[in-house]
Amino acid sequence: MPIPLIDRETAEPQTLDEIRDWHHGIVDALVEQRASIQHAIRQSSAVAPRFVGMTEGEVDAHYDADRRELDRLTVLNLVASAEGTLKVDYFRRVAEKLKDSLSVAYRKWHKTLSAKKQLRPDFDDGGILDVLKKTQVMDNNIIGRYRECLRTRHWVGHGRYWSKPVEVDRLDPDDVYDRADALLRAMPA
């Protein structure tokens, strides 16, 4: 049964809290920079070349776009972090042959996969999340609320070349943090 080797020296997992703290720090910097540029424009002071000739409204539009992009990238990062944590847990349960119901279900499903899929199992439909849901080790609503974040993650992470899912504009980083955190906290030990 192939299990991928995880190189702990080159892996760079991020916790949800690290991602949230990074996001808050960048938001603070954007707010400060926006205020500084707005003040400079009002005072007719020098501004960075990219802001020369901009009105306050154009500066607002610029920083609104930056914030929107930051939020989307943060959502991607939060969802991917939770996915990574669940995959590491999945491989640990399969490799260590634990006896709890989730581990047994994971192993049973893992054995049905091709060698290639055993190394990179599906995550959402027909994958790890479905096995997790079927074992009923947590409230399935928690899984469902996390799944609602996946379309945004895929759209941002895969180049945005198809129509924007409605969730992109409905989900903010705090909501996604709460959903991902609830999922990880509900995982059995």
Regions found by a protein language model. Give the residues of each.
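Charge-enriched, short contiguous segments at helix-coil
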Residues: 133-189
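Charged alpha-helical initiation segments
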Residues: 1-72
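Surface-exposed polar/charged interaction patches
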Residues: 25, 29-36, 40-43, 47, ...
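Generic structural signal for well-ordered, non-membrane alpha-helices
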Residues: 46, 50-53, 80, 84, ...
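Short, hydrophobic, well-ordered secondary-structure elements
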Residues: 67-93
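Generic structural signal for well-ordered, non-transmembrane alpha-helical segments
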Residues: 24, 28-31, 80, 147, ...
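Short non-catalytic regulatory patches outside canonical folded cores
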Residues: 87-144, 163
